[in-house]
Amino acid sequence: MQATHSSSNQASAGVYGKVYLIGAGPGAADLITVRGAKLLAQADVVLHDALVTEEMLALCPQALKIAVGKRCGKLSTAQQFINKQLVDNARKYALVVRLKGGDPMLFGRADEELRALEKHGIEVEVVPGISAALAAAATSQQPLTKRGVARSVAFFTSSTAPGESDQVNIPSCDTLVQYMGGREATATAQRLLAQGRAASTPVVVVENCSRDNQRILRLRLDELESGLQQCEGPVLVMIGEALASRAQQPIETNQQQQQDSQNVA
């Protein structure tokens, strides 16, 4: 499909278009921001991740679409090639969208793409999206923080670049959220148990978050390995006492609330 807003004189005149790094959100097309949807409807070309759905791409029927997917364990597009595609398309088109799953600034390789665009003096804007961690917490109705139980949250991934050690330090936080979990989350569970974390620690796994085939697994830490064997799609793993069911968590008393208010004051 040909783009509708391209400028044939851009390349010859040395003029670049503007590039938007847009967060597509966790998956469902209606979870993209209003600004993101408006820009998609105006885009000349959209370079999109592998996890972006057809329903999301239907928001930009006028645009040329280029798949530049990166999936763990699958054939992926090299990041240098993606960077070059962004620059080359900014030479051809006035409005270029780089559509990323979740939020561009969290495990989205945004730094590398921003550097490539800035090197060529190309104007760029980042449009945030709903990250998978927040969407998973919402869809499972499990807050990541809870007064008196969990005051800190860490987002991390065990996926590493070639040549890097695969022994990623596990953050020391009340609630752990592991992106791109899969096999790596099994190793995380084993290490946490070896470090003395209780086997009964609550775990919530969300597979295919916000999509029609979404699935939520509620497990214990010592059940995570067997639970993940059921999963085939992208998963996000949340670990910590805040993930216990509300029936298992005490209701905060007025006295506790007053004490916390005094401590804050």
Where are these regions (language model features)?
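Residue-level signal for well-ordered alpha-helical positions
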Residues: L59, T139-S140, R191
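Short, acidic/turn-prone active-site loops that include or flank metal/cofactor-
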Residues: P26, L51-T53, G69-S76, I130-A132, ...
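Class I S-adenosyl-L-methionine
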Residues: M1-V127, E223, Q230, V235
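Short, well-ordered alpha-helical microsegments
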Residues: T53-M56, A133, G163, A185-T186
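Short hydrophobic alpha-helical segments that form membrane-spanning helices or hydrophobic packing faces
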Residues: V34, A135-A138, T188-A189
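Short hydrophobic/aromatic-enriched beta-strand-loop microsegments
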Residues: L64-K70, G121-E125, L144-R151, G196-V205
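A contiguous loop/helix-start segment that scaffolds small-molecule binding in enzyme catalytic cores
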Residues: Q2-N9, Y16-L21, R91-V96, S152, ...
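Class I SAM-dependent methyltransferase SAM-binding "motif I" and its flanking Rossmann-like core
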Residues: D103-C173, R215-R218
